[in-house]
Amino acid sequence: MSSVFSALARLRRTRALHPDGLVLRGTLDADGPAVLPLPRGEHEVLVRLSKGAGTPGSLPDVLGLAVRVPLGGDRHWDVLLSTSGGNRVSRMTPLPSTHWEGRCYGSVVPFRRDGDLVWLRAVPQRRTRRIPPNPGALATAARNIPLHFTVEESGRDGEWRAVATLVVRGEAHEDVRFEPVLSLPPGVEMSPRWLGRARVEAYRESRAGAARADGTAARPGAS
């Protein structure tokens, strides 16, 4: 499977996964008790919204929401979410969206901490605003009116509980590589473990293929 991502990246001359996106500034305010170690209080974050398959123009796609959460010092947690369903079954299914605030963004697979399985999602607070799924429309919209999300977590019972709010605003004008598998808080891992290893390999091959296409070096494990 990794060779597929590498070949696709070489063909596109960019990463195979989430090739088209926009890095923005944001604020994460974690104010509720949570199983996952979100830092309490308000923190500045970097956010990347992207198209998973890189469909042309404003065609629907599985959209991605990556958030770099500061953990203190030089440590951070790169949380990667994709548009998905909201119930106990569909929360594990990536689903395409016709606009940036059209669906919730979920972790799809759970995190494991102290034996607990925990899913994470970001729910748009304004679903009536239809921002076409292309980076240009997103840049204009975020510059004028910030995007607001409620961050929720859920255990095996399928009940969602609000743990934070996320506000996304104008462009950050930074080239950031998110590392959703390698940048995890202490004591937290992706479940199952084999899927985490597979994602590391997929991201590595995606970036290596793009690097071979343009003659640059790739860093393993980044998205």
Locate the predicted segments by residue.
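Active-site-adjacent core segments of small-molecule enzymes
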Residues: 1-223
